[in-house]
Amino acid sequence: MLPSDTIMLLSVVNMKLRDSYASLDALCDDLDVSEEEITAALAGIGYAYSKERNQFV
């Protein structure tokens, strides 16, 4: 389960992307979460997914 606090979500998602997943799509598939839900939550605090960096920046 991913945290509901957006700052914690950012930290956890970026850590998982860095350490365990080659893409946001792979993370979402494995954790059975919506990519749109994560990207919308993090967009709300000014972050967007960068495919080149495989991180939210």
Outline where the language-model segments fall:
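N-terminal acidic leader/helix
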Residues: M1-S23
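Short, charge-rich amphipathic interface segments used for partner binding and complex assembly
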Residues: D32-V57
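Short alpha-helical "recognition helix" segments of helix-turn-helix
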Residues: L27-C28
